Structures are given as structure tokens and as C-alpha cells.
């Protein structure tokens, strides 16, 4: 290491980090040139805990993989078992799942934008975003009965139906939310401070997206719209879903992808409710769970989430593997550092990834000469 090179730690406790991890930034003078990310502070072993449990208990654990996008985990868990057991859920349940999934996407993107704006010292816009988010949280609570761990999905459908009065309330609050959102996006697009701290900062080129296998708004901000798994979902195809993408690949592009995805999510919710009104019947079926292996993927707010499972005829989980989007997105971070002039920009580039640490934690054990050797997870 030359005389000008130095390493500084960020975390595991830091004002800009939503969850604990340590970023070891390598600096050449003031400019970041490399990073090493150390994890392991919040590993809980959920995959191992699920083994041997019935899938009706496993779905509650799946909801606790992530505290921000808990809903998409239960939806993917349920749809994986429905795929293995060839269970066809009612149309009502399909559209209600879309409504709730998109509400969760909106609230997650609003948190991501708020945290990013805090990292570039735009506290006013951050507080505005969190205030507007309460409209969405109220809708989620009205539909599911809860605000965080919603307990809404079951194998074979959903737990609660909605009525005409609730639908009118959703339409009314979405109108209010859209008006606020337009003002927020205008401030973000035209603000000189935001442009100074966001444009041409943390650039992730298209070829590095392909190399690191980044997913979600990260790769869509670098020109890869086909990464959105909603394009492959039959219900979203019925709703004529259109992916949002940009080519610049910088912090600004990633945040604008999230803002524009919120607009598309609002449209999808309205469209899903219109289709729901035309449906009749129940919201769930009695599920006969059959043994087998299978996997299912959905588009979480941060990107592709995968559940791979093996279950018995009685519904006991033999093995489960969960891959969350931040696993891939963290690897892309060090390539963003090349266009970060200062340490402060390295921090904002990190928040533009919108990482979720708790759902990324994994424990790897290597067996050598009959001895188990735990391996810590590091992204170099």
C-alpha cells in the first residue's frame, strides 16, 4: 500500500446504515478505490430453522426473512408450494396478491429514496417521503390488518377479502398519494443539490451489470429492463405491465427508476382492482400439498428473489434455499466506487443500492477432514 493509500471503516453502526455491516473503504487520498464488505452481525439461520417444519409454519418464518419486503417472501413461498403441488388459486386471490405486493413495493421504494436523500443531506425531501409513505402503510393495514408482517398470504390464496367501501378508500388515497408523488419527483429531478450529488456518481456500466449479475432497480438503471421478473408473471401480463429502465447507470438513474416504478405500481393496483371487481367466488382454496421439488421467483422491491424447496407429501419442508437480491447487488458496489470522487459519494452510492442486510446473511460451512469450518461472508 502506497503512502497515499488508507483504509477507513464505515459501520457496523453508522447513521446512514439501516442494518449493521462493515464497509472497509480503501482510499487513495480522498478518492475511494476499493471496498470490502463484512457481514455476519444479524445472521439468524432461518433456512435451517424451517427444515422439518410444516409449510404452514414455514410461511411465518419466510415473512421474517426481511422486515421491509416481508410480503413478497410469503407470496414467493406460497407460490413455490402451489407450483410443486399444482394448486390453482382463485382469480380473486391473484389480483389481491398483486395489489398488496405493489403497495409493499411503493413503501419500500419510498424508504429507499428517503435514506438516499438523507445520505446526500437533503433531509427535507427525506422527511417528505416518509410522511407520504404513511398513506401507503394505512392502505396495507386496512387490507391485511397489519403494517409490517402482514400475515396475508396462505397456501391456496389469501387470508382476507376486501369490500366496496375498502376499494373506494384505496382509490381515494391513491389519488392523494399521486398528487404528492408528482411534486416529490419534480423536486428530485430539478434540485441542484440532488443533481450535484447524484448525476455521474456511482456509475455501474451495462457490462459490469452482466458480470456481477446485479438485479432489480440497480440493473434497470443501467439499461437492462428484461431483468424484471414481473414480465414473466401471467397475472402481470394480463395487467399489461411495462418495466421502467434508464441507461445512465448512476445514482440518479437508480433513484429515478424507483420513482417511476412507483407510478407504474399505482397503475397496476388500479388495474388489478378493476379485474378483481369482475371476479366471483372465494379468495382461497383448500390446498392438498403434494411432495416434490421446485423453485419460484418473484420481483421483490430490490430485485429477483428465489425460493427453491423440497417438501414431503404431508407438507414437511425437507430443504429450502432462499436467494435474495442484495446478495448479487453488493458485489456491484465496488464497481460504482470508480466514479465516486469522495468518501461521502461512496456512502451515497451504497445507499442507492438499497441493500437489505438481514435477508442477505448466510452461514457457509465447509467440511474438511471430517471437521466443520464456518466461513464468513465477504464481498471483495
Curated annotation (Swiss-Prot):
> Does the record carry Methyltransferase as a key word?
no
| Keyword set, alphabetical order | Oxidoreductase
Alphabetized Pfam families for the sequence? Complex1_49kDa (PF00346), NiFeSe_Hases (PF00374)
Q: Which GO terms describe its molecular function?
A: ferredoxin hydrogenase activity; NAD binding; nickel cation binding; oxidoreductase activity, acting on NAD(P)H; quinone binding
| Domain of life of the organism encoding this protein | Archaea
- Alphabetical list of InterPro entries matching this protein: ComplexI_49kDa-like (IPR052197), NADH_Q_OxRdtase_suD (IPR001135), NADH_UbQ_OxRdtase_49kDa_CS (IPR014029), Ni-dep_hyd_lsu (IPR001501), Ni-dep_hyd_lsu_Ni_BS (IPR018194), NiFe-Hase_large (IPR029014)
User: Which family does this protein fall into?
Assistant: Belongs to the complex I 49 kDa subunit family.
Q: What is this protein called?
A: Uncharacterized protein MJ0515
Organism listed in the record = Methanocaldococcus jannaschii (strain ATCC 43067 / DSM 2661 / JAL-1 / JCM 10045 / NBRC 100440) (Methanococcus jannaschii)
